[in-house]
Curated annotation (Swiss-Prot):
Belongs to the helicase family. RAD3/XPD subfamily. It catalyses: ATP + H2O = ADP + phosphate + H(+). GO terms for molecular function: 4 iron, 4 sulfur cluster binding; ATP binding; ATP hydrolysis activity; chromatin binding; DNA binding; DNA helicase activity; DNA polymerase binding; metal ion binding. Residues 7-322 form the Helicase ATP-binding domain. It comes from Drosophila persimilis. Keywords: 4Fe-4S, ATP-binding, DNA damage, DNA repair, DNA-binding, Helicase, Hydrolase, Iron, Iron-sulfur, Isomerase, Metal-binding, Nucleotide-binding, Nucleus. GO terms for cellular component: nucleus. This is Regulator of telomere elongation helicase 1 homolog. It comes from the Eukaryota.
Length: 1009
């Protein structure tokens, strides 16, 4: 690999580095050499991660070589009888021994990022370099690395952690016991770089625990990869035995570092948590006194006594009483108190700095006891004890000698907890607040001090966490990301001394990027997604028309980012109702960002597959969502990005209000903190910068960035955009008329395709086979040349190819507003709704797509273009039924997607066995096309009721299923319903199905009720 000398250090880079990469590596090396801190911004696509790894490891390798030479020289001097011989010889030997034990004093690197996917990406980059032989390890969670089958069966990460600890403590985990004997195995020690997947694979091969084995590699590793929380959370650092002295800390993707620092120091406790903890302690005490302890926890001696339990219960009762006594003046929004309230509440219950460690140890023992007992009886598994342990650990991590700073940096916010809010049997509560506070769990009635409360202990000073990190005697801290600007307020908030800072330009030429502010749509309606205008039907329509016009021009992938899930959902609903959704789908199939992990992966795969088609695809996502954070849309995957608005945090959210108030109170000329309003604006702009960074991913990439909100014309807003974006907008950015933008955009892509190096030719789409079923609707088909047998002529194949693209778009149509519930309005203890959940789909206006052959090619309307043979007819739930739709189009054939069903001529003597579609969306579409609207309405109603979980609802469901799907021709759909039932009902379902088949065989002509 080419070698470049940068800041006096030879750096091996996979290719000749560009100037921006040289500048970046120079800043990194200077920080490491001088032991100082740096804040470095380099746009996504400039090789930031590669430069970071090569520069830091080149410096480490140079230091290793220098120290090795020093030790060799010292050893030689000692042997030659030099100054180190004789009485001083022992000193030389001691120096060499200590040097070897500490890798000759060479610092180690800790590379931290937000997610494991980002860490895996960094490790893949490392494998491409000349430093791939340097020792590295990644630290992951038990959820990712545990291979014990019993532990992995547990639901919830906390349960897995506790059961793992229990098995290790009791020496019953054979995988962990093999670590000592297998840790030097060549398969484990051989590879220099092993990511999560590598560790799991080797662990399964050697039947050795990957989680504990990875910790064996840390001591000898030159670079350790880990997520942020392992590094910034003192509790996690202690659990993972992470030593930070003389360590180089690299925080990649650090644009969210302030929030992460704040959240790692924040915690929450509910009245219901304390109440359940009291119940759990009481239960254990009853077991002790009733002689059931052998059945519950075995006959081995306990690590705690009845006196311990009695004392703990008394403390919890006092804590419950103290929380109940807190007055909430405003039941809707809650009441804010100084940080001292949290220490007062705990003090009243005798939780103090002095006994904190002892109580935390007791709580951990109780958790392990309940994990054992839960194997023999139905009880909670100690989630509330874990929550209490986290509370005490975080609150008392703030030492008494810095309490004055704690009072400035923290606030206690108390709100009313819904009386009917039950945490369930698991009792597992998340101790740390995630994201902005949701207000869905606040009741609006009553101010009684006896009402259940939620007590939030919130940190608003990210510098508090960073200061604790610096106090561990680290050598250097480097914060880096593609979107850190503006740097001054970031440095001021983190309150760390920064010697090196950098704002790199982009690696691409000006001609490779087209950036415009679109302040008005094609109809000259102002585009502004503020609170007053976001419900304006004219605005929503104009935004849809803008996206439609851009989709006609942009080749391949088009990304559209919305400020929030509710706004995305609102637009989707409006466009579906008006027909704009169908118009956009004609140009490109549409994908919408789901919120479930599994659905997200499959949706992304479908999107990438759709990009191979000549039409490309549209992906609609949300700022701060998964798509905007770290995903790669290089080349054809993302040729343009549309930003539809500024994603401001909820203005009236208590946490937002308190953050703004904290900044206004503590802002001085000396500390250069942002004002509350500046922070509020910057939080939105940083999310925009992240979304923009999805499209330009490397030196030869090109794309367009369209800012579809007139507020981007404000100079204050533009100044917070990344430096390379500001260069394209100029000193006084102005919105351009829509017409000229369309012409310029078309010319930009035409010029780019002619002059820029294009990626490899896309794979040709496989022809769509056996998915179009022709139903005879009228006696005079519009295109008589289309035959029943698919693929027999070019015209049919062309229509076929178009149909599958539109079908992919249709899979999104049945998503509902509930699937995109606002993060600000979500109940704190409630899981986010699953956008792909089968039951949730039944609450929506399920759309049906008919593929009708165009009958008027010369009319210029009603199709996807003059050459298209497929048109879309959208039918809402309130629209006429299938029979009505058919009746109005008696001269056409209707092509309806029926997955995996081959079209064959009907036979009176035999009938082909059908199988229900595997996709839930396809299942619903096919069912709806075969039954009446009233039947489908009844079907949806009982399915929604079935979710409540009672046997009566199962009986109601079966009654409707037998009424709707009992006919022989519908039997395949009846059978297909089985996979959507809960496990406890599947056996009964099989009995009903067998009875149904038997009745049909005995009376083939009799209708089954």
């Amino acid at each position: 690999m080419p070698e470049s000398v940068i800041a006096g250090i030879p750096v091996h880079f996979p290719f000749e580095p560009y100037n921006v990469q040289r500048d970046y590596m120079e800043k990194v090396i200077i920080c490491l050499r001088d032991g100082t801190n740096g804040v470095l911004e380099s746009p996504t696509g400039t090789g930031k991660t590669l430069s970071l790894l090569c520069a830091s490891l080149a410096w480490i390798r140079t230091r290793q070589s220098e120290h090795q030479q020093q030790m060799i020289k010292l050893k030689a001097t000692s042997k030659e009888g030099g100054p180190g011989s004789g009485p001083g010889g022992d000193l030389s030997e001691l120096a060499m021994t200590v040097g070897q034990a500490n890798n000759w004093g060479v610092p180690k690197v800790i590379y931290a990022s937000r997610t494991h996917s980002q860490l895996n990406q960094a490790m893949r980059e490392l494998k491409r370099t000349a430093y791939a032989n340097m020792r590295s390890v990644v630290l992951g969670s038990r959820d990712q690395l545990c291979i014990h089958p019993e532990v992995m069966k547990e639901q919830g990460n906390s349960n897995k952690v506790n059961l793992c600890k229990l098995r290790v403590h009791s020496k019953t985990c054979t995988f962990q016991l093999r670590v000592e004997s297998k840790k030097d195995h060549p398969d484990f020690r051989g590879p220099s770089i092993m990511d999560i997947e590598d560790l799991v694979r080797v662990g399964q091969k050697l039947k050795m625990c990957p989680y504990y084995a990875s910790k064996e590699l840390v001591a000898q590793a030159d670079i350790t990869f880990m997520p942020y929380n392992y590094l910034l959370d003192p509790k996690a650092r202690k659990a993972n035995k992470i030593e930070l002295g003389n360590t180089i800390i690299i925080l990649d993707e650090a644009h969210n570092i302030e929030k992460i620092c704040e959240e790692s120091a924040s915690v929450q406790i509910r009245s219901s948590d304390v109440a359940m903890a009291i119940e759990d302690v009481t239960h254990i005490m009853k077991v002790f006194t009733s002689g059931e302890s052998q059945e519950a926890g075995g006959d081995e001696p306990k690590d705690f006594t009845l006196d311990d339990l009695t004392l703990l219960k008394e403390m919890l009762l006092e804590l419950e009483k103290a929380i109940d006594a807190v007055v909430v003046d405003n039941p809707t929004d809650g009441t804010t108190y100084p940080a001292s309230l949290m220490y007062e509440l705990l003090g009243k219950a005798n939780f103090t700095y002095g006994n904190c460690a002892t109580i935390v140890a007791l709580l951990d023992k109780l958790v392990q006891y309940l994990m054992v007992a839960s194997q023999h009886m139905t009880i909670r598994k100690g989630g509330t004890f874990t929550m209490l342990s986290d509370l005490l650990t975080i609150v008392f991590a703030n030492k008494e000698n810095i309490m004055s700073k704690v009072h400035l940096s923290f606030k206690v916010h108390v709100q009313v907890e819904e009386s009917n809010k039950q945490q369930g049997k698991s009792g597992a509560i998340q101790g740390k607040q995630q994201g902005w506070l949701g207000k869905g769990n606040i009741t609006t009635t009553g101010t009684s001090s006896k009402a259940a409360k939620i007590v939030n202990f919130w940190c608003f000073n990210p510098g508090f966490g960073m200061e604790q990190l610096l106090n561990t005697q680290v050598r250097s801290v480097i914060l880096t990301s593609g979107t850190l600007a503006p740097l001054k307020p970031l440095i001021a908030e983190l309150a760390i001394p920064v010697a090196q800072h950098l704002e790199n330009p982009h690696i691409v030429d000006q001609s490779q990027v087209y950036v415009k502010i679109i302040g008005t749509g094609p109809d000259r309606q102002q585009l502004i997604s503020n609170f007053k205008n976001r419900d304006n039907p004219k605005y929503i329509s104009s935004l849809g028309q803008t996206i439609l016009n851009v989709a006609r021009i942009v080749p391949d992938g088009l990304l559209v980012f919305f400020p929030s899930y509710p706004m995305l959902n609102k637009c989707v609903d409006a466009w579906q109702a008006s027909g704009l959704w169908a118009d956009i789908s004609c140009k490109k199939p549409i994908f919408v960002e789901p919120r479930g992990k599994d659905q997200f992966t499959s949706t992304m795969e479908e999107f990438y597959q759709a990009i191979r088609d000549s039409k490309g695809a549209v992906f609609m996502a949300v700022c701060r969502g998964k798509v905007s954070e770290g995903l790669d849309f290089a080349d054809r995957n993302g040729r343009a990005v549309i930003i539809t608005g500024l994603p401001f945090p909820p203005l009236k959210d208590p946490k937002v209000i308190l953050k703004r108030r904290y900044l206004e109170t503590n802002r001085t000329k000396e500390n250069q903190l942002l004002s509350g309003q500046e922070w509020y604006n910057l939080d939105a702009t940083r999310a925009v910068n992240q979304a923009i960074g999805r499209v330009i991913r490397h030196r030869n990439d090109y794309g367009a960035i369209l800012l579809c909100d007139s507020r981007f014309q404000d100079a204050s807003q533009v100044q917070q955009l990344s430096k390379w974006i500001r260069g394209h907008l100029g000193a006084r950015p102005q919105s351009s008329p829509f017409g000229p933008i369309v012409r310029e955009l078309r010319q930009f892509f035409k010029h780019a395709e002619e002059t820029m190096k294009q990626p490899d030719v896309r794979e040709e789409e496989q022809p769509l086979m056996n998915v179009c079923k022709v139903e005879e609707v009228g006696t005079q088909p519009v295109i008589p040349t289309i035959k029943q047998e698919p693929g027999n002529n070019a015209t049919f194949r062309k229509a076929n190819k178009s149909a599958i693209k539109v079908e992919m778009a249709n899979s999104i149509n049945s998503w509902t507003p509930a699937d995109y519930a606002s993060a600000a309005g979500r109940t704190l203890g409630k899981a986010a709704p699953n956008a792909m959940d089968f039951m949730s789909r039944l609450d929506s206006n399920v759309s049906s797509i008919d593929f009708n052959c165009s009958g008027s090619a010369d009319s210029g309307s009603g199709g996807c273009g003059s050459s298209s043979l497929v048109t879309i007819h959208k039918r809402e739930r309130s629209s006429p039924g299938v029979t009505d739709t058919v009746a109005t189009q008696t001269t056409k054939k209707r092509y309806k997607l029926a997955e995996n069903i081959k079209t064959e001529p009907k036979s009176n003597s035999s009938q082909q066995v059908k199988v229900a579609p595997e996709s839930r969306a396809d299942f619903l579409r096919e069912l709806r096309s075969l039954i009446s609207q009233d039947q489908f309405r009844d079907f949806g109603k009982v399915l929604i009721e079935y979710r409540s979980g009672t046997d009566e609802n199962f009986e109601s469901l079966m009654t409707v299923l037998l009424d709707v799907l009992a006919a022989p021709k519908m039997r395949y759909l009846f059978i297909g319903m089985r996979r959507f039932l809960r496990n406890e009902h599947k056996a009964e379902f099989d009995v009903r199905l067998a009875s149904l088949n038997l009745a049909q065989e005995s009376s083939p002509n009799k209708r089954i009720p």
